[in-house]
Amino acid sequence: MKQGLSLTAAGVAVALVSFLPGGPAQADPGPPSVEAAAFRPIDTGDRAAVREAVLKRLRPALAAKVKWSGSVSGCVAGKPARSTQQATLKAVNFFRAMAQLDPVTFDAGLSAKAQKAALMMDAENSLNHFPPRSWKCWSKAGAEAAGRSNLCLDCTGAASVLEYMTDEGPGNTAAGHRRWLLFPFVGEMGSGITSGAGALWVIPGERVRAKSPAWVSWPTPGYFPNELDPAGRWSLSASNEKIDFARAKVSVRTADGKALAVRRHKPIAHGRPNYGSPALVWQVTGFALPTGTRSRRLDVTVSGIRVWNQADTALTRKKITKKYSVRYFDADVA
């Protein structure tokens, strides 16, 4: 049974951890570096392209068996098998490709620390971004990674990436796991995997320059497979750090104009970079996923978005409205 993906603790951890480059790799090199697959962005305007990506990129990654060489009883961190790391990386980069973001690589040093974090979570059968020294298999490197990683218990490898993207649960209304996975300004992550827990180092030591879309949403605009529906928890992030969602309003309508029920969560505020980019998260209910060859279009309007001035002293007069459409479809049907 999957445990909660504890974002509340993660949010606090992120707020308290400064953006400093990670320290040198430990003597144990940990899991090997895995180069990012050369995934070009997925054309979400093309149903066939999205379907092909789901069938050939995502599903094989999710089906990969989790293998690792460590031992919980012996507090041996070990390493994931290369095939397990590759599958996890492919899952991460699939979701980034759906959002038109650059792929990432897994850094060996970050992965070694994340591996020790995953070991602690598995050994203690619990999740904590501030694991106390009393925990089984505690290590300084593992504790550091715990504060910078997405954590999952009873979900590991590529399957944990899907859990992070869904980001269900009352403690995850900021969709932090998802938003860090889709953070535009990161080039390296680290992956720790045991048979019972996963730790994915997602918070960068420093931001990297990257081409990024102005907006990063989930679900993404265009064709979107039913199987990736995030249980109605939608999000919109801004690459521009000056964006302010404090008074933004959201509407989601069907293709015939029917308004769906929307519950807006507390926005991720401007000026809090340790929580990732400014963002708005909301819950959508009242629609059914399509079957057969049909698709179902949902039109999103986010209005009342404001922009801070360059000095961050006041909001400008500028107001932005962001509109986009999502077309759900069944990827099992050509």
Residue ranges and their predicted role:
Residues 1, 10-11, 157, 162:
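Generic hydrophobic alpha-helical membrane-segment signal
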Residues 2-112, 116-120, 124, 187-188, ...:
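N-terminal targeting leaders of exported, membrane, and organelle-targeted proteins
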Residues 5, 11, 108-110, 131-134, ...:
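Solvent-exposed, flexible loop/coil residues
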Residues 124-129, 164-169, 209-212:
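Short linear motifs at secondary-structure transitions and domain/linker junctions
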Residues 64, 89, 128-145:
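Extracytoplasmic/secretory soluble proteins
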Residues 30-40, 136-200:
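A well-ordered secondary-structure block
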